[in-house]
Amino acid sequence: MDSAFIIEKSVVIVAVFALTMLMAMYSTWAERKVAAFLQDRVGPNRAGWGGLLQPLADGLKLFSKEEFEPNTPNKFLFVVGPAIAMSTALMTSAVIPWGDKLHLFGRDILLQATDIDNALLYIFAVVSVGVYGIMIGGWASNNKFSLMGAVRAASQMVSYEVAMGLSMIALLMMTGTLSLKEISAQQSGMNWNVFYQPVSFLIFLICAFAETNRTPFDLAECESELIGGYHTEYSSMKMGFYLFAEYANMFISSAILAILFFGGYNYPGMQWMVENVGVNTANILGFLALFIKICGFIFFYMWVRWTIPRFRYDQLMHLGWRILIPLAILNIMVTGICLLLFK
């Protein structure tokens, strides 16, 4: 392993983490702007041009706030909870293929922190660990509302992970791989998986809302019942970590949706661009294409938040266990039959 490879990977890893954090930060600004647009308001417009410096102002505010710690028997777990939630949100970005290779300085640089064969399985494993961050934070807060919110979040996320995993089986039966890069490469042009697996896409999209605790599945932190949910007792940057993790998860789930079902970094005419314009230009445009798809899904997340009311908890569980899981199993059966008959 030469030093150039170590430097290359270090730069890519730092860039990927920086991109994830930057998108999570500016998603807060976008959320407020989208809410203002849908409610016929202006939104944040004081800090910088168009309010573009508002995320920095919010970050400084959180840094400067006083930290309150409840009278809890385990202060270590109170600190570990938000750290786990934040860490798992960033770790999932490591296997996302942000584009194809760039040829720079005589080397082929992969726009991915690491390319592993079981990337999809890695994402499911890391996301499941994120449940511990919420559960530990709620339990260590020594507050009944925090604990109730944490239990809700844990049961919701575990329940919808089942449906999400089953929705992926039908897609994996078609692609034959767990590698996100290979799945993306198979969708060159407009050969997108969403046209072949619309049911898997719909189930995965609904489960993504539940996994990120977004409206209409934000039962873990609904203000009318649980004050602030599992982060009721948190303040300053500990609370900021929980909020940051939510937007980072929203960004990563949007990237996964774009890669699995909408071609990832592929776009119509990409092969022509490679042959006639150049590999680097074509692949930079591929990164921009993926970024546009991700922004489209992020806007959809925010649009849904301000247009659809919150479900009741029994409706949430009914949808997950009695509708989505049977539908995902039926989709697996239909996909298997179609592969046997037509492939």
Curated annotation (Swiss-Prot):
Output the GO biological process annotations, alphabetical, semicolon-separated: aerobic respiration
- What Enzyme Commission number(s) does the record list for this chain? 7.1.1.-
Is-annotated flag, keyword Oxidoreductase? Answer: no
Q: Name one Pfam family in it.
A: NADHdh
Please give one Gene Ontology molecular function term for this protein. Answer: quinone binding
User: What reactions does this protein catalyze?
Assistant: a quinone + NADH + 5 H(+)(in) = a quinol + NAD(+) + 4 H(+)(out)
Enzyme class, one word?
Answer: translocase
> What keywords are annotated for this sequence in UniProt?
Cell inner membrane, Cell membrane, Membrane, NAD, Quinone, Translocase, Transmembrane, Transmembrane helix, Ubiquinone
User: Which Gene Ontology cellular component terms are annotated?
Assistant: plasma membrane
Keyword flag Transmembrane:
yes
Q: Can you tell me where the transmembrane regions are?
A: 5-25, 76-96, 119-139, 158-178, 190-210, 243-263, 284-304, 323-343
Give the membrane topology, semicolon-separated if more than one: Multi-pass membrane protein
Cellular compartment(s) = Cell inner membrane
The protein's matches in PROSITE patterns, at most eight in alphabetical order, are given as:
COMPLEX1_ND1_1 (PS00667), COMPLEX1_ND1_2 (PS00668)
Subunit note: NDH-1 is composed of 14 different subunits. Subunits NuoA, H, J, K, L, M, N constitute the membrane sector of the complex.
Similarity comment text for this entry: Belongs to the complex I subunit 1 family.
Q: What does this protein do?
A: NDH-1 shuttles electrons from NADH, via FMN and iron-sulfur (Fe-S) centers, to quinones in the respiratory chain. The immediate electron acceptor for the enzyme in this species is believed to be ubiquinone. Couples the redox reaction to proton translocation (for every two electrons transferred, four hydrogen ions are translocated across the cytoplasmic membrane), and thus conserves the redox energy in a proton gradient. This subunit may bind ubiquinone.
| Name this protein carries in UniProt | NADH-quinone oxidoreductase subunit H
Task: Specify the taxonomic lineage.
Answer: Bacteria, Pseudomonadati, Bacteroidota, Flavobacteriia, Flavobacteriales
